[in-house]
């Protein structure tokens, strides 16, 4: 029986990425034309075509302005997660700043979704050994898992020496790393995002197949709504930032659809987290179906 992988979406607008930070400071976000609703709904339609439920990690800023988008995702059966409020890398924050940002985002997202949020993903995969205190704060705020580890070599984020497999950070919190393919002594980033846009499709497919077949476990993939938006406005940023943001946007949707046809996908909670902590593999009611917000030990 094919392994079900985890598909996740970091819901942010095109002007909210680190690559666009120089041209779109946070205090100017409201002045940019938003594409996040249309792009996210395009993903809703694509996932519905293949009967796929994914995890949508919402930016709190987006959830506060477009609460209906959050509730739509929930009503469609997708898991709702938290992607911070202001999209500031955690290693640029103090513990107090991180707590305030994350708490605000979680509250806004839960109010819009009507269910408690179990999962967190840091902007730019920015929880690493230098900010180990962040895990304790996540647990205190009621999160059950973090998916902020991307164990690859990268100029800005990641730790190529980090764990590739999910692991418990504490009794109440698990870390669920993004998919990497261990080959020739290196961790090859096959977990999506810019890597899916830029790398040959066969390489991503081979890496995910190897994780499923050789390691007998699911991989976690991610993308952003703006990555399927070839028509997004081009902002005046550096050459390297343009390359990070705009390279092969035209290929992303076709590559994503090929993955959806060739692999099975589900939410991060049900395909990766639950098997780690619950042998019965049954989700709590608050995550299995749309339900009023309940702050219980299960959620």
Q: How would you label these PLM feature ranges?
A:
Residues 188-198:
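Surface-exposed cleft-lining segments at the edges of enzyme active sites
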Residues 1-119, 124-184, 203-299:
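Catalytic alpha-helical scaffold of carbohydrate-active enzymes acting on polysaccharides/glycoconjugates
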């Amino acid at each position: 029986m094919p392994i079900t992988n985890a598909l996740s979406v970091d819901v942010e607008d095109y002007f909210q990425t680190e690559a666009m930070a120089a041209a779109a400071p946070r205090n100017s976000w409201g002045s940019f034309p938003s594409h996040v609703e249309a792009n996210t709904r395009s993903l809703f339609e694509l996932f519905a075509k293949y009967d796929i439920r994914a995890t949508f990690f919402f930016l709190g800023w987006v959830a506060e302005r477009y609460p209906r988008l959050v509730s739509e995702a929930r009503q469609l059966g997708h898991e709702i997660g938290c992607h911070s409020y202001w999209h500031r890398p955690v290693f640029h924050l103090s513990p107090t700043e991180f707590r305030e940002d994350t708490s605000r985002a979680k509250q806004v997202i839960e109010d819009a979704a009507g269910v408690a949020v179990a999962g967190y993903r840091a902007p730019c995969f920015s929880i690493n050994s230098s900010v180990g205190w962040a895990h304790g704060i996540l647990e205190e705020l009621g999160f059950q898992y973090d998916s902020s580890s991307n164990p690859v070599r990268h100029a800005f984020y990641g730790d190529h020496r980090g764990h590739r497999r999910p692991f418990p950070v504490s009794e109440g919190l698990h870390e669920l790393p993004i998919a990497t393919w261990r080959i020739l002594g290196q961790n090859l980033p096959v977990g999506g995002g810019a890597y899916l846009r830029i790398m040959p499709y066969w390489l991503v497919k081979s890496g995910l197949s190897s994780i499923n077949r050789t390691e007998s476990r699911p991989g976690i993939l991610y993308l952003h709504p703006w990555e399927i938006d070839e028509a997004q406005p081009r902002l005046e940023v550096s050459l390297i930032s343009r390359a990070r943001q705009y390279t092969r946007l035209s290929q992303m949707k076709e590559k994503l659809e090929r993955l959806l046809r060739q692999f099975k996908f589900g939410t991060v909670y049900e395909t990766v987290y639950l098997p780690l902590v619950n042998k019965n593999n049954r989700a709590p009611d608050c995550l299995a179906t749309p339900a009023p917000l309940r702050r219980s030990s299960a959620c």
